[in-house]
Amino acid sequence: DTPGVMLSSAARSFANRYGVAIGKAVVLMASHDSGWHDVFALAKAGVGIAAIIDVRESVDSALMHEADRLGITVRLNHSVIGVSGRHGVTSIKICNNDDYLGRRVDCDAVLMAGGWTPSVHLWSHSKGSLKWRDDLGAYVPDVPNENVQCVGACAGDWDFGTGAVIDMLPTPKDQSRIKAFVDFQNDVTAKDIKLA
């Protein structure tokens, strides 16, 4: 509950939406590539990145290259084992996952990125079984109990439909009276976006 510890995606949102830098010496604790991309975006926006700490023994070489290009220190096969600071982060303690010898890293914010997990709660409520996918590091729907099929992100397919555009479906209604929802939860239609 120390102020200054948050999800990397939240820190990126603060920077992109409000122009707020979450810190001057930020550390990322990651076990997933998405956090690296968040930190790269922050670094390009002028936020100081003290280090990337990743529990994995290896990551994509493109990530390492970009971190090097941006001057970001990377510690692979390491974990954050402690956060210091009473009213905010002042430092973290990290250790190598093999020898557990701790060392201190000064920072004023800690970002976390543990990856993405499919939302399987409704699937589980319908008594569908789950299976583990090592490539995702997550549980995904397996055998259904009801007549249900999961696709896209809820099935762990993060790129499903990336770049795809679906033409307007045929309808007998007057085209000017059709609602094309962009966001069901917030009741936003294509007309609302055009108007904005």
What are these regions (language model features)?
Residues 1-196:
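Residues forming the flavin
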